[in-house]
Amino acid sequence: MKGVIMIIDGMADRPLEKLSGRTPLEAASTPNMDRIAESGINGIMDPIKPGVRAGSDTSHLSILGYDPYRVYTGRGPFEAAGVGLDVKPGDIAFRCNFATADEDMIITDRRAGRIRSGTSSIARTINSMTIEGFEDVEIIFRESTGHRAVLVLRGPGLGDKVSDADPKVEGKPPKKIKALDGSPESRKTAEVLNRIVKESYEILRDHPVNTGRIERGEAPANIILPRGAGAVPHVEKFQERYDLKAACIAETGLIKGIGHLTGMDVIDVEGATGGIDTDLESIKNAISSAIAADYDFLLINIDGADEAGHDGDLEGKVRFIERVDSILGDLMGDDIYFILTADHSTPVSVMDHTGDPVPIAITGPEVRVDDVTSFSERAAAAGGLCRIRGSDVMDILLDLMNKKEKFGA
């Protein structure tokens, strides 16, 4: 038997007046998701616990059975692992956005127009930076998918207790990065980062990629916004923890990084952009191939619904959910326990993550079937799983796969 957890990133939402009180998931035509719900057991899930606005990183860790409060040191190390950087003890890693700033250093687009190309050239320019007075700090910078990138600082006397530069909204300048614990290490790191942010604008505003984007009426990627500082955590390998050979199919560096740090085989998919324009057919083919291989467990993350939620794109979110549904019919099998869920809610009305629970459906051999006949936030709440937490998912899956040890006599 194989176990598959498919996470549609940010799929869950809230009822909207524009949809006559329905959520985007309820409004979408999802015959395959409905079939999964009808053939299995359903419920709603708090990725971490009720009311917690989970990040994609902490929610995935929780769903995989890791305690995010113990192993999560920040987003940066996972992003770095996801783009293939060998982060060493003492390194401090950050997730970065390519963003757009005007001549007054006001952020006008936090994602540089959802930039898709040219980022490798921009990254090489950042990677060549040195900061005067801090020549002992090596700057390692690499692009990830879309507007995402990774920064690693390597050198003596650095600390990870620093704040973020990202103002979280347009119309404001980058936040001044501050030491959070007052230590000399964190103060040094904060000073280096503030210089990097300022000097990134100076060296990127006339970069050929950006002059070309401006000529085409596109937002330039002329500044970087570091956030999510973290040192490399110790994470127990998934196969050691569960005795399951595992693979990860994901689009973003963040989730690939979780796969890498937990020891999964990470399968790259050409055309997987992490956006609503992603090549779902290629993703489907990669999933089918992985299911046919000798893996016991697959973690799958598809990201476009989250992007649409962050952009407030209601129609785009509905359409993307329908596109995902169209690839699911070919992925079911008689020897597969298939779990369909989201990692958090990203309501289009909020344009950010919220603490609302997400729907979850589990189907497979001898799964107890409840009376739910469609897959949505509202329908799943009436299911046999009732309300669970992300940390329950692996226990339930292992029990179904007959991989769970008995507790007690």
Curated annotation (Swiss-Prot):
Residues 163-173 have a biased composition (Basic and acidic residues). Pfam families: Metalloenzyme (PF01676), PhosphMutase (PF10143). It comes from the Archaea. It is an enzyme of class 5 (isomerase). Keywords: Glycolysis, Isomerase. InterPro entries: Alkaline_phosphatase_core_sf, ApgAM_prokaryotes, Metalloenzyme, Pglycerate_mutase_ApgM, Pglycerate_mutase_ApgM_sf. Its EC number is 5.4.2.12. It catalyses: (2R)-2-phosphoglycerate = (2R)-3-phosphoglycerate. GO terms for biological process: glycolytic process. GO terms for molecular function: metal ion binding; phosphoglycerate mutase activity. Residues 163-184 are annotated as: Disordered. Pathway: Carbohydrate degradation; glycolysis; pyruvate from D-glyceraldehyde 3-phosphate: step 3/5. The keyword Isomerase applies. Belongs to the BPG-independent phosphoglycerate mutase family. A-PGAM subfamily. Catalyzes the interconversion of 2-phosphoglycerate and 3-phosphoglycerate. NCBIfam families: apgM, PRK04024.1. This is 2,3-bisphosphoglycerate-independent phosphoglycerate mutase 1. The lineage of its organism: Archaea, Methanobacteriati, Methanobacteriota, Methanomada group, Methanobacteria. The gene is apgM1.
